[in-house]
């Protein structure tokens, strides 16, 4: 049987010294263009620092991530010919990955401006518990709440 490979250790980003920011840069990256992704994220942080004078952009980012990351989600399980949506707790690593994905998707869907401006706007909205990515988290939580009756079918 093959040996199970562990997780790849991701270093910290060079400006903020934060592993979460480094993971977010990797999530924003397209086609292996890390320099472009890094510029987008750092420009978004600079826009946040400019618009919200006196607030640390890293704190705004952390607050936004805590408001976007889901605690529970529904997973499909087939039981006797019927498929049930079973609410499950989300692991910490998946929680962050979902938050990154939703933030990136809903920032990109905003109209008109550069990606850095759209990302900054979505981060600021998420920090204030608004924005499309927070709505997505609320929708996932609502689905889990609606299917609470099937929680005893856990995997």
From Swiss-Prot:
<dbReference type="GO" id="GO:0019843">
    <property type="term" value="F:rRNA binding"/>
</dbReference>
<comment type="similarity">
    <text>Belongs to the universal ribosomal protein uS7 family.</text>
</comment>
<dbReference type="GO" id="GO:0000049">
    <property type="term" value="F:tRNA binding"/>
</dbReference>
<dbReference type="InterPro" id="IPR000235">
    <property type="entry name" value="Ribosomal_uS7"/>
</dbReference>
<keyword id="KW-0699">rRNA-binding</keyword>
<dbReference type="InterPro" id="IPR036823">
    <property type="entry name" value="Ribosomal_uS7_dom_sf"/>
</dbReference>
<comment type="function">
    <text>One of the primary rRNA binding proteins, it binds directly to 16S rRNA where it nucleates assembly of the head domain of the 30S subunit. Is located at the subunit interface close to the decoding center, probably blocks exit of the E-site tRNA.</text>
</comment>
<protein>
    <recommendedName>
        <fullName>Small ribosomal subunit protein uS7</fullName>
    </recommendedName>
</protein>
<dbReference type="Pfam" id="PF00177">
    <property type="entry name" value="Ribosomal_S7"/>
</dbReference>
<dbReference type="InterPro" id="IPR005717">
    <property type="entry name" value="Ribosomal_uS7_bac/org-type"/>
</dbReference>
<keyword id="KW-0820">tRNA-binding</keyword>
<dbReference type="GO" id="GO:0015935">
    <property type="term" value="C:small ribosomal subunit"/>
</dbReference>
<dbReference type="GO" id="GO:0006412">
    <property type="term" value="P:translation"/>
</dbReference>
<dbReference type="InterPro" id="IPR023798">
    <property type="entry name" value="Ribosomal_uS7_dom"/>
</dbReference>
<keyword id="KW-0689">Ribosomal protein</keyword>
<keyword id="KW-0694">RNA-binding</keyword>
<comment type="subunit">
    <text>Part of the 30S ribosomal subunit. Contacts proteins S9 and S11.</text>
</comment>
<keyword id="KW-0687">Ribonucleoprotein</keyword>
<dbReference type="GO" id="GO:0003735">
    <property type="term" value="F:structural constituent of ribosome"/>
</dbReference>
